């Protein structure tokens, strides 16, 4: 805590908002005096003691517009100029320059470039304040809208459909799940004691079914049981949406928000990635390995017990090989699980505040957790039991 992990992420997310507002009119909130409110304000108080300035510089690698200079984000404060920053970091980019000290924020990207980036990628942020309303919480203590019907909203050019920061999306994802389930079901007609599909292409129906199965696979990994989504009859009391075990058709959960806090948080996180990709291109919900983008997650282990951290999270991340995940974590179990599932070369670990690249077992939280375990009675009794098995005569086997 306090080493700057969230500060780094806040600059990345701020660049998302600054980039998005170049094209989308609803990406940021307007100011009465003109311009827009910053997602991240520039606070000189954040300058470290003993230094006179701070800055953040981000250069994106943009395959969507190879003929244009990639998007550039720079935020600075204190006794430093843009030209100073360029010189310190050997940055040879002509589109940004300046000799003025003090607070300044710059984002270089064209409207067309931004439109293409958001159209072809998932860009989102799951902050530490992400929250899912518990099923037991009274409505008067939590303001939320219920969207439990197939989506009928229009899309408007110039408006951002996928919110950058993701908060309490259970109902929104449930509405979308109803759309996915509806698309995966065909009209059935009876003819001469037989049933057949009508008004739909079998090939298209199978593709839509795959989108549904991708979401069912995510939930199956989280729950640890093979489950599917079931729609109850409209005449029956209670939720129409059930989570059912495939093996015996037993209802595991009567509705999505009956999952545990950790389970629903995980499902919403990865379902939202598919939801956003689906909004851009419906085929992306079918082919998860083709979803591209950047997903930023602060404190990914939030609400998750040890098994979800070590075994489940890495499996879910592995389902999206073309997504760049930028994650902060205090959990050594999560990193061990990532190494076991994806291999050492599939991800990089940087320890703050110096930004040093380290291997998993050099992570300070791992060493600290190990030291805590050594102090337990269970650890000491296991060591003593092991010591009793060592022969007292002859050469020890090393």
Residue ranges: model-predicted function:
Residues 1-188, 204-213, 217-228, 232, ...:
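P-loop NTPase switch/coupling surface
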Residues 1-33, 236-385:
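Switch/communication elements of ASCE P-loop NTPase nucleotide-binding domains
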Residues 177-202, 246-253, 294:
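Short glycine/proline-rich turn/loop motifs
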Residues 198-218, 223, 238-258:
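Accessory N-terminal region flanking or inserted into the helicase ATPase core
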């Amino acid at each position: 805590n306090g080493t700057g992990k969230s500060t780094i992420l806040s600059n990345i997310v701020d660049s998302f908002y600054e980039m998005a507002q170049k094209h989308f009119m609803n990406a940021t909130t307007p100011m009465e005096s003109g311009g827009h409110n910053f997602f991240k304000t520039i606070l000189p108080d954040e300058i470290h003691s003993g230094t006179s300035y701070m800055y953040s510089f981000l250069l994106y690698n943009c395959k969507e517009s190879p003929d244009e200079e990639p998007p550039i984000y720079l935020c600075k404060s204190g006794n430093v100029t843009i030209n100073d920053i360029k010189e310190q970091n050997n940055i040879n980019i002509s589109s940004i320059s300046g000799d003025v000290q003090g607070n300044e924020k710059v984002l270089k990207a064209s409207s067309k470039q931004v439109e293409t980036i958001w159209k072809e990628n998932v860009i989102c942020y799951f902050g530490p304040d992400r929250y899912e309303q518990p099923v037991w919480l009274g409505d008067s203590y939590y303001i939320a809208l219920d969207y439990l019907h197939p989506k009928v909203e229009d899309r408007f050019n110039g408006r951002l459909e996928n919110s950058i920061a993701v908060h309490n999306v259970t109902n929104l994802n449930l509405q979308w799940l109803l759309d996915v389930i509806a698309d995966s079901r065909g009209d059935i007609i009876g003819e001469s004691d037989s049933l057949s599909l009508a008004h739909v292409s079998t090939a298209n129906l199978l593709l839509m079914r795959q989108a549904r199965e991708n979401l069912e696979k995510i939930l199956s990994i989280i729950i640890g049981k093979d489950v599917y989504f079931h729609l109850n009859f409209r005449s029956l009391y209670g939720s129409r949406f059930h989570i059912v075990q495939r093996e015996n058709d037993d209802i595991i959960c009567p509705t999505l928000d009956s999952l545990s806090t950790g389970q629903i948080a995980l499902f919403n996180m990865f379902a939202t990635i598919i939801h956003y990709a689906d909004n851009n291109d419906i085929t992306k919900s079918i082919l998860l390995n083709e979803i591209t983008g950047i997903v930023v997650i602060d404190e990914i282990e939030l609400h998750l017990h040890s098994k979800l951290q070590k075994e489940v999270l890495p499996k879910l991340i592995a389902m999206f090989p073309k997504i760049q995940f930028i994650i902060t974590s205090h959990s050594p179990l999560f990193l061990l699980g990532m190494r076991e599932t994806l291999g050492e070369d599939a991800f990089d670990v940087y320890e703050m505040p110096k930004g040093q690249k380290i291997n998993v077992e050099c992570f300070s939280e791992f060493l600290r957790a190990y030291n805590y375990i050594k102090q337990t009675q269970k650890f000491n009794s296991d060591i003593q039991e092991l010591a009793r098995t060592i022969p007292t005569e002859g050469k020890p086997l090393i």
